[in-house]
Structure formats: C-alpha cells, structure tokens
Amino acid sequence: MKYDTVVIGAGLGGLMAALSAAERGKKTLVVSKGMGIITIFSGTIDILGYYPVQDSAPLSSPREGVERLIAEDPNHPYARVGLEALEEGMSFFQDAVAREGVTYVGSLDRNFLAPTAVGTVKPTAFLSKSMEAGDVREESDVLIAGFRGLKDFYPAYMAHNISTSRVSGISIPHFRGRILDVDIGADHSGMSALTLARKMEEDDMIQTVGRALFRQVRDGERVALPAVLGIRSGDDVFRRLEDMAGTRIFETPTLPPSVTGYRLYRALERRVRAAGIRLLIGYDVHDPEVARGRVGAVSISMGKKTKRIEGDAFVLATGGLVGRGVITDRKSTQEPIFGLPVTGPSKRSEWFTERFFDPAGHPINRIGLTVDDQLRPVDDTDKPVYKNLFACGAQLAGYDALREKSGGGVTIASGFKAGRLAGEL
C-alpha cells in the first residue's frame, strides 16, 4: 500500500499531524499500536504554566512566557515550532473538535486557574467549555458535588485541599463538598467515571441529578461536578444541568482514565475518519526501509499478519517514555523503530536529581529526539537523519512538560507543523 503521508502514532500529536497533512490533500494513513495516552489525560491543553520552571507563581499570559522561552532557549520545541505555528495549530485544533461537537475555549493570552480532583490548582490555557466556569480567581464560592459509589472523586477531600491552597496573588473562594442523594447504580466495588458518563447521557439521570443539585446549591455558588457529563460531548448535558440547578456548573477532570481525555480522543478520531484518513490501531511498526537519506517504507504487523506500507513522508508521533516512543534498558536509551539518536543523560544515575520535588525538574523528563527547525530528527552533527521523517509531541527533547505545564501546546503545535511539512513533500 502506498500513501503520501504515513503517521506512526495515534495520540494527540499523531492525529493533529494526520489532519494537517490531509488538509493539504494528501492521502494519509495513521498506524499505531494503541490509542495513545490522550485517553487518560485530563483533557485540558496546557501551553505554558510556569516559566522559569523554578517560579512558584503560575504565568498569567502563556504567550508572553512562550516568547521569552523562545528567546532564551533555542533548543526548546517551542523555538523549533515557532509562535506562529502554535497559534495556527491551536486554532486548527479548536476547529477540528468543534466540528465533532466538543467546544474548547481559551487563548494564548491568559491562563485559567483550574481546580483538580485532588484539590490543587492548575494553570492551563485551553479547556472544554464544560470546565470554563471553574477558574478559582472568580469570587463566587463553589459546591463540589459528588456521587456515592463513584471511584476516585472525593468532594470533602478536594474541598479541604483547595481551600487551604496558596496561589501567589490569588484569594481562593470557599469550597465545600457534598455527596448528592442520587442512586447511580454502583455495586460494592464502585463505578468508574466512564460508566457514569454513559449513564449521564440518559434523560432520567439528567433529571435526577439536576433536581438533586437544585436542592443542595446555595445562592451565589457555582457547582463543581466530576467530569462525567456524557461521553460524546459534555456541552449539552452541562447546559441542561445548569438550567435545572439555576447556577453555573463546571466539570473537574477525575483521576485516569479521564472522561474529558476520552471525549477529546473520540472527537479527533471522528474528525480523522471524516477527513478520509485511514486509521489502523493494534499494529506494530517495524523494519523501516531506508535509502539515500530517505525512508521509503515500513512494515506493520498484527499477530502473524504483516503488511508493507510505502510513503512519501513519515511522521513519528509515538510518544516519550510513557508512550514507549523512547525506551530504556540498563545501558542505553533508544528510539525503537528507526534507531534514531536520543538526547539525554547517558547514565541512569543522571536521570534524577537528589531532591524528589526539585523545582527545576529531573533530567529524565527532557529525554527525547533533537530536531531541526523542520522537525526532522538530527544526528550528533545536527544534520537530519532522514529528509522525509518528521517527529512531534512528547518524543521531542529539551522540555519538561510536567514542570512547565506545556505538554498539550507542544504536542498540538509540533503535530500541526509536522503534518504540514510532511504534506508539502
């Protein structure tokens, strides 16, 4: 089989790359072992929450932070991608998911300060419309409403932690936690957020929860609910509940697996298929065929079944250490498909600093592929290993998504740009 663009990896970066290439009229394939960690992450899109990373105060403006970062760190993925591609990529992303019924709000000019299920405050630039009312800078108090039998969401615990949090320059409103008098049908082992989200698409459940909220909420309060307001969208369910409760409602992402991440993945998957992109999940990718500085084909296999896939351009979006796009053993760190050079500490003893909560982060979090301004992986002489192979997402070296709170922005921007560049070949 022959394609114009072959994207390896079906996470956020891979799907963005595929959509970007397809927009340029390219026959595109996405092939992956699995769905990527997008299905377990919070669903918020972090652009830049902290810079420098040692700062304890979150950035007010991601744009200003990115501009400064690009000027000071030319090896950071944002410097390779550029601010223009970040802006275009985020607009492209918002349009893609909106077409599938999932609305994302936000901008590069202002971070939200969103509460988390464990009671911390997280800076993030873009989030689902169903989370918009949760910014802790708003003065109105918050009722955290939970469900008896729902796993991993504890309103009293969240309320206590967030009410005692300290965020520089911010006065956090009062949070109180309550369990709603609603039978969700959980058995003795409890119910997952995904299961409850499916139930929340039923009219009877929406009516029951709406009435329970109306009885609990006080004048002037907002309501925080676990992110269980439907699998497909979330927008319609939360609007109906707002009407019934008579106040603003927002979702709070639960611990993994997260409904908001799953919802986002399904929206992107629908958009990918609508764009005519072929999506193959469950395949190993191996045995690349290379000649004269270019990748000509790869083999993909499921069990004993193997296929040869030719392509004019290839985008590698297999993730970092968590996604196994970079793997390690006791002696080395490798990129497993193409054998690309990996940038990072050569010794395991250098992966971590002595302080577990080191404000500067740990070197292992910056491991990945070094790329040029065209997002092509380079060798130790800074020359592209293959002229038609691009990389994006968590696989890139030189940034610490955990400390910077930059993972979503880097992934979307680099995926968008990699797909565009691949589509130009």
Task: Describe each PLM feature range.
Residues M1-A79, E84-E87, D95-L425:
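Residues forming the flavin
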